[in-house]
């Protein structure tokens, strides 16, 4: 995401802070709309007052739900403060207004993960599997299926995907894990080794080593 609209050019003097904030407070009395609140949030953030900055941006978006710069800043500050409910609320607005902007999509995904909202996360990925970022959505959904022990769903989703995109390490990783969990060890090992060739991954390497050890044990018991 772009940096916060923090007006970093303001020098960190108490006097300057008072002058600028007073200007916007007077304008707020005259206009009583979102714009002075937005700028008050900016100046407070620039001088390190994150809590009051967030409050001003919240007031700004309560007056104008379509004030994108205020939402943008509020979301970034909420992420920094790890206030994920607030971040998710703002990102629903930003994603609605910019449905193909990947930085908002991926950050909203991160917020849903932090909140543990698995059903909403599944719906979110499903809503994008036919869009411009379908590779990301399919791999994200597949990984969600793996994490929630839905290996068969992951296998069905990733099998045609890997045939179409055979050189994507994450897709190969998901298909490899789902194959192993459904007792297709040889196929799973092949997918995981191919994934590892394309991208170093400690989890994949650990799985490959584990499957190879299991094969040796089984071979020795014959």
Swiss-Prot record:
Keywords: Repeat, TPR repeat
InterPro entries: TPR-like_helical_dom_sf, TPR_rpt
Residue stretches of each TPR repeat: 34-67, 169-202
Record-given protein name: TPR repeat-containing protein BH2049
Biological source species: Halalkalibacterium halodurans (strain ATCC BAA-125 / DSM 18197 / FERM 7344 / JCM 9153 / C-125)
């Amino acid at each position: 995401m772009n940096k916060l609209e923090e007006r970093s050019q303001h020098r960190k003097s108490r006097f300057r802070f008072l002058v600028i904030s007073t200007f916007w407070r007077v304008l707020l009395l005259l206009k009583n709309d979102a714009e002075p609140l937005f700028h008050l949030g900016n100046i407070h953030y620039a001088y390190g007052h994150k809590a009051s900055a967030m409050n001003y941006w919240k007031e700004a978006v309560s007056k104008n739900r379509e004030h994108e710069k205020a939402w943008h800043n509020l979301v970034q500050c909420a992420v920094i403060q790890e206030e994920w409910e607030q971040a998710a609320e703002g990102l629903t607005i930003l994603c609605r207004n910019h449905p193909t902007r990947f930085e908002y999509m991926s950050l909203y995904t991160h917020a849903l993960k932090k909140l543990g909202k698995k059903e909403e996360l599944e719906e979110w990925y499903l809503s994008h599997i036919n869009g411009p970022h379908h590779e990301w959505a399919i791999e994200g959904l597949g990984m969600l299926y793996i994490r929630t022990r839905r290996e068969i769903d992951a296998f069905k989703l990733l099998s045609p995907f890997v045939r179409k995109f055979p050189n994507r390490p994450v897709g190969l990783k998901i298909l490899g894990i789902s194959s192993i969990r459904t007792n297709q060890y040889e196929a799973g090992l092949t997918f995981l080794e191919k994934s590892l060739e394309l991208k170093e991954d400690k989890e994949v390497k650990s799985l490959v080593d584990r499957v190879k050890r299991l094969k040796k044990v089984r071979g020795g018991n014959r």
